Amino acid sequence: MPVAENSLSDPLLVAKRQEILALAARHGARRLQVFGSFARGEAHAASDVDFLVELGPGATLIDLGSLQMDLQDLLGRKVDVVEPDALHWFIRERVLREAIPL
């Protein structure tokens, strides 16, 4: 069943929300949003979690990679972390439209 617009209902992400946000802050990331199958309510056991983040001042690509690894450890599944500017033009509008703030 699809999620309501702009609401996050996946039990895993809801349960781990505070820990996810704490990891993001520790790595200099802000404005965490979920997109892809988790945002659309179509996630299954093998789905990865797609996060859209903005890096704060002073944060580096190393921080982005470390955040990705820490999120994978926390959630127990593959995670992709991407900045809005890094989105391919072909999917950019769709991703920005479906992204749900964490």
Whereabouts are the PLM-identified features?
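Structural signature of FAD isoalloxazine-binding scaffolds in flavoprotein oxidoreductases
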Residues: 53
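Conserved histidines in hydrophobic membrane contexts and catalytic metal-binding motifs
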Residues: 34
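Catalytic core of pol beta-like nucleotidyltransferases
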Residues: 1-31, 39-45, 56-102
